[in-house]
Amino acid sequence: MARTKHTARKSFGGKAPRKSLATKAARKVFPVDGQVKKRYRPSSNALKEIRKYQKSTELLVRKLPFQRLVREVAQEIMPNVRFQSAAIQALHEAAEAYLIGLFEDTNLCAIHAKRVTIMPKDMQLARRIRGERG
């Protein structure tokens, strides 16, 4: 039987070949002091972050950017308006409380749809159920 030349072809689909243990071991970072740094899974880091922010009471949106936003919106409605610092603080607290509640409802909508990732449609549904316009 005669030999024929085989030309290289592009592969479409299928599983990628697994990386060997040598390449995985070479990728690990070893600190100078000799101890191997434990790397946490992304899901456990996310859960740790959720617990941290649920325990805390400090505001999550920075003060100065929020203040600039409030002043910018107020300038469009009524120029030369002044704010007391207590008024901006009250607006800040109210805005964060609203956002936290909205994200909680959005998360419930995502869970109801048997998902763990929130999507814009979850937020739209949460706002519609709340009866908000806009």
Curated annotation (Swiss-Prot):
SMART domains: H3. It is found in: Nucleus; Chromosome. GO terms for molecular function: DNA binding; protein heterodimerization activity; structural constituent of chromatin. Acetylation is generally linked to gene activation. Methylation at Lys-5 is linked to gene activation. Methylation at Lys-10 is linked to gene repression. CDD domains: HFD_H3. PANTHER family: HISTONE H3. The nucleosome is a histone octamer containing two molecules each of H2A, H2B, H3 and H4 assembled in one H3-H4 heterotetramer and two H2A-H2B heterodimers. The octamer wraps approximately 147 bp of DNA. This is Histone H3.3-like type 1.
